[in-house]
UniProtKB/Swiss-Prot annotation:
Function recorded in the entry: Catalyzes the reductive methylation of 2'-deoxyuridine-5'-monophosphate (dUMP) to 2'-deoxythymidine-5'-monophosphate (dTMP) while utilizing 5,10-methylenetetrahydrofolate (mTHF) as the methyl donor and reductant in the reaction, yielding dihydrofolate (DHF) as a by-product. This enzymatic reaction provides an intracellular de novo source of dTMP, an essential precursor for DNA biosynthesis.
Chief place where the protein resides: cytoplasm
Identification of the protein by name: Thymidylate synthase
Ligand binding ((6R)-5,10-methylene-5,6,7,8-tetrahydrofolate): 203, 297
Regions annotated as coiled coil: none
SUPFAM superfamilies (alphabetical): Thymidylate synthase/dCMP hydroxymethylase (SSF55831)
Stored Pfam families: Thymidylat_synt
Protein's organism: Cereibacter sphaeroides (strain ATCC 17025 / ATH 2.4.3) (Rhodobacter sphaeroides)
Subcellular location as annotated: Cytoplasm
GO molecular function per UniProt: thymidylate synthase activity
Length: 298
C-alpha cells in the first residue's frame, strides 16, 4: 500500500505535468488543475503532517485555535510568534500610507501598540467571524461551530452538519476571501467522525500542508467534544495550483521519500470547544526532511 503522503506528492507531480498555465490575481502566475481529492485515515492516530519537508505543525494548530476564538486581528497570532497572516495587512498599510516599513517593524508595532493593531492589524470578517459570529439579516449572530457540535451530540445521522465562511455579503470586506471554505462532518455507525474539507483555492506547496494539519486538529477537537472517535479526513481542492515561483521547490519535494507519519493526540479533555490550548496537542514521532523555503504570493 502506498504511503498516504505519496498521494500528495503525486498531486504535485500532476500539477507540474498537466497544470494549465494561468495569470492569477497576485501577478505571479500559476500552473493549475481543477478538482482534486486526498483522503487521510486518522482512526489509528496518524496525523497528515507532511514529512517530505518540515511542516511547523504548532503554527497550523495555533492558527486553527485562533479561528475558533472568532478573532480577526493578527495581534494574538503575533503574540504567539505566528506570522502567516502578516503579509495582507502589511501590504494594505504600505498602500495606504506609502511607508516602506519592514515586516519585522510592522509586526513589532502591532504587538506593542493596541491602537495601531486595531487600525492596521484587522483582516476584516474572515474565518473566525463567520464560523462563530455569522451575522443574519435580522441582526442576530449565529455560532456555526456550537451548532455543529450540538447536532453531532443530538442528531449524528444528520446530513446538515457543516459550517462555511463564504458570506457573500461580507467577502468584499475580507483581506482575503476564504480558501478553505466548507467543512462537513459525518458520523459512522460505529461512532467515528469523518470530515470533508472543500477548498476553492489551493496553494499546493505552502497552504495545503497547513490546511491538512489544521483540519485534522479541528477534527480531533470536535470528535472529543461530541464523544466520538476520529475517522477519515477527506480533502477536496477546487483550483489546485502551484505558483510559478514554487516549481523548483515542488520538484525538490517530489524527489524525497516520505517517512512514517507522526501521531497527534489530545492530552486532556477540554470543557468546551473554546477551552483548547496549544499545550493540549501532542505530536509524537515526527521526523521530516528539511524545510523548503518559498515566498507567499499576496
Amino acid at each position: 500500500m502506498a504511503h498516504p503522503e505519496q498521494h500528495y506528492l503525486d498531486l504535485l507531480a500532476q500539477v507540474l505535468a498537466r497544470g494549465d498555465r494561468r495569470v492569477d490575481r497576485t501577478g505571479v502566475g500559476t500552473l493549475s488543475l481543477f478538482g482534486a481529492m486526498l483522503r487521510f485515515d486518522l482512526s489509528k492516530g496518524a496525523a497528515p503532517i507532511l514529512t517530505t519537508k518540515k511542516v511547523y505543525w504548532k503554527t497550523a494548530v495555533k492558527e486553527m485555535l485562533w479561528f475558533l476564538t472568532g478573532g480577526t486581528n493578527i495581534r494574538p497570532l503575533l503574540q504567539q510568534n505566528v506570522r502567516i497572516w502578516t503579509d495582507w495587512p502589511l501590504a494594505a498599510y504600505r498602500r495606504a500610507t506609502g511607508e516602506e516599513i519592514g515586516q519585522a517593524e510592522f509586526e513589532a508595532r502591532i504587538v506593542a501598540d493596541e491602537g495601531f493593531a486595531a487600525r492596521w492589524g484587522d483582516l476584516g470578517p474572515v474565518y473566525g467571524k463567520q464560523w462563530r459570529r455569522w451575522l443574519g439579516p435580522d441582526g442576530r449572530e449565529h455560532d456555526q461551530i456550537a451548532g455543529l457540535i450540538e447536532t453531532l451530540r443530538t442528531n449524528p445521522a444528520s446530513r446538515r452538519m457543516l459550517f462555511h465562511a463564504w458570506n457573500v455579503a461580507e467577502v468584499g470586506q475580507m483581506a482575503l476571501p476564504p480558501c478553505h471554505m466548507v467543512y462537513q462532518y459525518h458520523v459512522t455507525s460505529d461512532g467515528r467522525l469523518n470530515a470533508l474539507l472543500y477548498q476553492r483555492s489551493v496553494d499546493l506547496l505552502l497552504g495545503a500542508p497547513f490546511n491538512f494539519v489544521g483540519a485534522a486538529a479541528l477534527q480531533l477537537m470536535i470528535a472529543q467534544q461530541a464523544d466520538l472517535l476520529p475517522g477519515e479526513l477527506v480533502w477536496v481542492g477546487g483550483d489546485t495550483h502551484l505558483y510559478l515561483n514554487h516549481l523548483e521547490q515542488a520538484r525538490e519535494q517530489i524527489s524525497r521519500a516520505p517517512r512514517d507519519w507522526p501521531r497527534m493526540q489530545l492530552v486532556r479533555r477540554a470543557e468546551s470547544i473554546d477551552d483548547y490550548r496549544i499545550e493540549d496537542f501532542a505530536v509524537e514521532g515526527y521526523e521530516s526532511h528539511p524545510a523548503i523555503a518559498a515566498e507567499v504570493a499576496v
